[in-house]
């Protein structure tokens, strides 16, 4: 297990890089670009480690070759130089982007095997380059288990190519679908090694890019859709506004009706109270008429005759009033009938003269009546004075 800096980028020229690590580091070859036929060589990296160094240099021993078993080396402390590795990191590590080169004949050199077969030892992977055209590479970052940091071996990067791409092949002791831990004894102690099969990188096709014309068509299409949606929204907003105005007007009408209903209820309560008061008065009047009716039965016969006479007088008075009304109607009808007659008719003139004489006579009669009354009053006064004069000597 290696603890190193978060980002390790393979140099395009295959130069050596240095990192600080605790544990076992395995080598990963780095492809160096070349203009013609070239042989890819692994890039070396000097590491400072507390563990078993690589077999190339350092103090201590280990499994220098997979084909032969050696005695287990002692635990060493020193500087060891190894090939470029893809260590197990704690953090997000950017993957190197090696560029493929066009070569007629190219041979690959495999990296050195791991220096010490520990719990986290991984077999080295060798890259066999083939004839390919160079293309931009896409780097895949590792997503780890602890909050987005990578806790494990970094994934290999896939080189995008239009024709042929270089596919790295994993060299492992066991080629299987799933990694299987193996227990191997060598020397004085047993080493528990876990061999994993690296995932083959597949060619990733470049994403199709939109041209300016296609982008303009999409923008125009979206603009038309947006305008249609805007029209629909405007229509719906106008309709909702009309509904809102209608609701407001209906709300005002409902409030007015509510006020009118409250007023009617108040008037109804007042009317009920007045009706109750009238009913109470009527009941009191009935209670008062009860004793009077009892007393009326005990009245003598004279009172009964007087009451009958009073009823007859009332009847006569009603008849006289009816007769006077009839006379007025007859006079009005005669006047209406006389309006249409000719005023030059001598009969009409004679009638007018007679009416004037009649009115004069009536006035004379009323005046004579008044004079006679005054004379009578004067005579009465004179008589009284005479009596007073004759009574004086006595």
Curated annotation (Swiss-Prot):
Tissues of expression: Expressed in adult male accessory glands (at protein level).
Domain of life: Eukaryota
InterPro entries: NSP1/NUP62, Nucleoporin_NSP1_C
Predominant localisation class: nucleus
Protein keywords: Chromosome, Coiled coil, Cytoplasm, Cytoskeleton, mRNA transport, Nuclear pore complex, Nucleus, Protein transport, Repeat, Translocation, Transport
Coiled coil recorded as keyword: yes
Stretches the record annotates as 5 X 2 AA repeats of F-G: 22-117
GO cellular component, one term: cytoplasm
Sequence repeats: 22-23, 50-51, 75-76, 77-78, 116-117
GO BP, sorted A to Z: chromosome attachment to the nuclear envelope; mRNA transport; oocyte karyosome formation; protein import into nucleus; regulation of nucleus size; RNA export from nucleus
Localization per Swiss-Prot or TrEMBL: Nucleus; Chromosome; Nucleus envelope; Nucleus, Nuclear pore complex
Region listing for Disordered, in residue ranges: 45-73
Biased composition (Low complexity): 45-57
Annotated coiled-coil segments of the chain: 211-341
Pfam families: Nsp1_C
One GO MF term: structural constituent of nuclear pore
Biological role stated in the UniProt entry: Essential component of the nuclear pore complex. The N-terminal is probably involved in nucleocytoplasmic transport. The C-terminal is involved in protein-protein interaction probably via coiled-coil formation, promotes its association with centrosomes and may function in anchorage of Nup62 to the pore complex. Binds to transcriptionally active genes. Negatively regulates chromatin attachment to the nuclear envelope, probably by preventing chromatin tethering by Nup154.
Protein family (similarity comment): Belongs to the nucleoporin NSP1/NUP62 family.
Protein name per its UniProtKB record: Nuclear pore glycoprotein p62
UniProt organism field: Drosophila melanogaster (Fruit fly)
């Amino acid at each position: 297990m290696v603890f190193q800096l978060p980002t390790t980028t393979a140099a395009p020229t295959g130069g050596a890089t240095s990192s600080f690590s605790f544990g076992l580091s395995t080598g990963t070859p780095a492809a160096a670009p070349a203009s013609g036929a070239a042989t890819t060589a692994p890039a070396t990296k000097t590491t400072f480690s507390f563990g078993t160094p690589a077999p190339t240099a350092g103090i201590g021993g280990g499994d220098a070759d997979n084909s032969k078993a050696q005695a287990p080396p002692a635990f060493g402390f020193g500087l060891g130089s190894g090939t470029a590795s893809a260590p197990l990191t704690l953090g997000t590590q950017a993957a190197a982007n090696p560029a493929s080169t066009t070569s007629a004949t190219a041979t690959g050199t495999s990296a050195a095997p791991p220096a010490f077969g520990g719990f986290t030892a991984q077999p080295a992977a060798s890259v066999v380059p083939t004839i390919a055209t160079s293309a931009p590479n896409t780097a895949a970052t590792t997503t780890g288990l602890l909050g987005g940091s990578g806790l494990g071996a970094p994934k290999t990067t896939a080189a995008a190519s239009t024709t042929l791409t270089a596919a790295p092949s994993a060299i492992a002791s066991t080629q299987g679908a799933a990694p299987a831990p193996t227990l191997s004894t060598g020397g004085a102690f047993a080493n528990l090694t876990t061999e994993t099969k690296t995932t083959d990188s597949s060619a990733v096709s470049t994403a199709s890019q939109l041209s300016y014309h296609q982008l303009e068509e999409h923008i125009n299409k979206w603009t038309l859709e947006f305008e249609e949606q805007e029209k629909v929204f405007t229509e719906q907003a106008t309709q909702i506004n009309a509904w809102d105005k209608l609701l407001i007007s209906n709300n005002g009408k409902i409030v007015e009706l509510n006020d009118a209903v409250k007023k009617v209820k108040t008037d109804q309560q007042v009317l009920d109270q007045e009706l109750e008061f009238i009913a109470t008065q009527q009941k009191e009047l009935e209670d008062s008429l009860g004793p009077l009716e009892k007393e009326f039965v005990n009245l003598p016969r004279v009172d009964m005759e007087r009451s009958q006479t009073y009823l007859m007088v009332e009847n006569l008075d009603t008849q006289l009033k009816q007769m006077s009304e009839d006379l007025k109607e007859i006079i009005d009808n005669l006047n209406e009938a006389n309006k249409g007659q000719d005023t030059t008719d001598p009969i009409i003139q004679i009638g007018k003269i007679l009416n004037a004489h009649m009115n004069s006579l009536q006035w004379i009669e009323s005046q004579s009546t008044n004079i006679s009354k005054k004379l009578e009053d004067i005579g009465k006064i004179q008589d009284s004075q005479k009596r007073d004069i004759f009574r004086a000597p006595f």
